[in-house]
Amino acid sequence: PEIELTPDAAAEADLPAPAPEAIAVLDRIFWERLPAMEIGAIYQEVNPVGGPEKAKAVADSLAQTKLTMADMVYVGDSITDVQAFEAVRAGSGLAISFNGTRHAVNAAEVIVVADSAWPIAMLIAIVQLWGKEGVLEVACPETRAKSRCLVLPEAVIEPIARGLEGRLFNLYDQSAENLDQVVEESQAMRAKLRGEAVAALG
């Protein structure tokens, strides 16, 4: 049955029937039946990824690739990305909030509000050819009007242009005039794409 989480429910007992019964069945499956199966070993090895784990994953990635933090582009959207954002920015990498919560928007260097991931592809292409400064030049309203012509190869720009066609896409940096308005715009897009309940997480 569908499990409806009502706004006034503070505990499982507050949920309308048959939600408590369904939750009890799921509990038995996940805590009794699955651990007894061979596949249950996988669940024992799973490490939920929070803020410290994401920051550690960034460091581990750099250790494996022999790159530096300045080479890093990190895209995140919630409070669990803040520690990674801070580490990346401290090391001169690029931290991008993509339809992020208030925490993500405030911690990132560049903020993307969009209804598809194509803007991220465009920013990565700019980074590859022009570096982080190229992205900041495009994102900053003070330099956008007088910025250089950041030319991308046709093989790169054509698929990106097709992907961006008809899409909603706004780009900001921390110098945005009204950052609170940017936060609201980012969270509204997040809710539109992911649903209110999921968007409210972190």
Model-based region annotation:
Residues 1-202:
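C-terminal cap/substrate-recognition subdomain and adjoining C-terminal extension
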